[in-house]
């Protein structure tokens, strides 16, 4: 288990207080990675050292990135089609029981809804790994394109970055994506050719691989 208790300064983490006494410390678990104490389990050396102070870390994930006006209603972002401004974008997360609720970031702060600008871009970052959905309310007068790709970029190909991922209309005039399972270092590379990519970092480095 992770023993992080505080963050005394940004990016620096500390455990709680451990009082060490000879002959009173935990037995070393057999086969545990990280155990480096000499002596037989339960022996004097083992009982005089605490090998349980482990620290767990992960790479935050992100999701985005584009709401556009589909002029020819084919579900594909063509070169002449531009971003759609004034669309409200919300992020939902599975609460562990299959119910999607408003998302929070890695600091347990509520993720704020975004309103797209003229470029149609949005991005939610600093997220814990999990199952997410994106909910979009377009400006008045706009409807969802009937041709949708709901596979949630399952093949990781750049072409999927151009496809609409709307899967349902839970509320009239509000549209929701399919579920995206985001994992640290497990997401597709962004392509330089696709409008809507707004992720920092070059293809192949950590920040790029942590976004979808």
Question: Each predicted region: which residue ranges?
Answer:
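A short, solvent-exposed beta-strand micro-motif common in secreted/extracellular proteins
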Residues: 1, 6, 91, 130-141
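Short, acidic Ser/Thr/Gly-rich low-complexity loop/linker segments typical of extracellular
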Residues: 71-78, 83, 94-122
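Surface-exposed intrinsically disordered loops and tails
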Residues: 1-48, 96-111, 147-212
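Predominantly extracellular/luminal cell-surface or secreted proteins
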Residues: 66-72, 90-94, 103, 137-139, ...
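A glycine-anchored, Pro-Gly-centered beta-turn/N-cap motif
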Residues: 11, 128-130
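Mobile, glycine-rich extracellular loop/lid and propeptide segments
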Residues: 119-123, 134-137
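A short, Gly/Thr-enriched small/hydrophobic beta-strand-prone motif that recurs across taxa
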Residues: 52-78, 82, 88-92, 203, ...
């Amino acid at each position: 288990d992770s023993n992080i208790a505080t963050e005394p300064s940004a990016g620096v983490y500390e455990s709680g207080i451990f009082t060490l006494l000879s002959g009173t410390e935990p037995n070393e678990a057999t086969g545990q990675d990280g155990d480096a104490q000499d002596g037989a389990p339960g022996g004097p050396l083992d009982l005089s050292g605490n090998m349980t102070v482990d620290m767990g870390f992960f790479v935050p994930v992100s999701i985005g990135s584009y709401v556009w006006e589909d002029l020819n209603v084919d579900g594909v972002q063509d070169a002449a089609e531009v971003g759609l401004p004034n669309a409200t974008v919300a992020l939902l997360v599975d609460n562990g029981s299959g119910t999607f609720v408003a998302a929070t970031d890695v600091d347990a702060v509520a993720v704020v809804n975004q309103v797209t600008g003229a470029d149609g871009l949005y991005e939610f970052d600093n997220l814990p790994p999990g199952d997410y959905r994106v909910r979009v309310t377009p400006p008045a007068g706009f409807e969802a394109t009937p041709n949708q790709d709901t596979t949630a970029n399952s093949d990781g190909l750049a072409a999927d970055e151009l496809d609409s991922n709307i899967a349902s209309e839970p509320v009239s005039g509000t549209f929701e994506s399919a579920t995206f399972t985001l994992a640290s270092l497990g997401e597709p590379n962004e392509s330089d050719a696709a409008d809507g990519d707004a992720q920092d970092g070059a293809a192949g480095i950590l920040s790029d691989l942590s976004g979808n």
